[in-house]
Amino acid sequence: MTIFQDKVKALRAHHEELLSRKNKPVEWGNGIYEKYKNPILTAEHTPLEWRYDFDEKSNPYLMQRIMMNATLNSGAIKWNGKYLLVVRVEGADRKSFFAVAESPNGVDNFRFWDEPITMPEDVVPATNIYDMRLTAHEDGYIYGVFCAERHDDAQPGDLSAATATAAIARTKDLVNWERLPDLKTMSQQRNVVLHPEFVDGKYAFYTRPQDGFIDTGSGGGIGWALVDDITHAEIKEEKIINARHYHTIQEVKNGEGPHPIKTDKGWLHLAHGVRGCASGLRYVLYMYMTSLEDPTKVIAEPGGYLLVPEGPEYIGDVMNVVFANGWIADEDGKVFIYYASSDTRMHVATSTIDRLVDYCMNTPKDDYRTQFSVEKIKALVAKNKQTLSK
């Protein structure tokens, strides 16, 4: 065996050790969910064949010819008994693409399929695509709604100027994708989610209207809109169902994460909220619930965040960020929340539908003033004194 072959053998052994590493819950949690000790996907989890040329003649130094930078913001679905993520993989060239990774148990042993997804182009090709939300719709298709980014040609002198539109594709097998025309909207959109059921015979979208590529501007929060024809989807009217508020976790902007989970108490929603701080923008996750009879009516919204970056999760390409656009609810009620930290790596947290409903229904809401927050704490202290004195 040559030195080159020895290096390849060692490389494959190291990679297999990473892929097969068992994951365990963090010992102490908050009772709402359990985080896990290890990230479930990193750039190093991507297949070696995507990165290395294993021909000794053309790559005698065994260099990475195509480097990967991050695995983040992944859609999720249970498919043929496996837990599948449609991962946003970002290369060293800053271009993102989609690739499927699957796990037998949802918390470890995630392995990518052999090749990335070949996503057909829209009429106007996109420079970058990312952050797919997966929805198994009652019409029989699995839809992927994702952001398509293009340069803003109205600002030719600004190489950072961009536009964001909601791209739509659908599939029956997660391999072959049919690209539909981008969603037509009255403003830029980069956080659009398809509701899993027809509403009044129409397709329903959660939206996030915004004035610019980054800034929401006059966009008031998470919106709701109905569309007649998914193959030529156009939003002509939308209403805000979950608004931004001053001095809250969603002061700067907010956006729907994955599609909501249907429960007998209402629709469970996972969203991200953004506020400004001295170090930049802080992204956290929060929850709310809407009515089964009227999905635009919020029936519960706990105050504050559900999940934030902790420890090593703070560190990465974009610091102090958690983002989720995928979760899976098992038949037994267990929920897998897939989230990215600092735009760098993927994690999982697990809970149950019962716990998440309890959290939403029984956690105090934000009343937007310090005085009311203190009153709630004092009320809980008094209740505990009475309970513990018995």
Residue ranges and their predicted role:
Residues I328-G333:
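Well-ordered alpha/beta subsegment
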Residues E310-Y314, V322-W327:
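Short glycine-rich, acidic/polar surface loops and turns
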Residues F336:
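Short, surface-exposed ligand- or partner-binding patches at beta-edge/loop junctions that are enriched
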Residues M1-N73, I77-T127, A136-V193, E197-V252, ...:
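Beta-rich carbohydrate-recognition and catalytic domains
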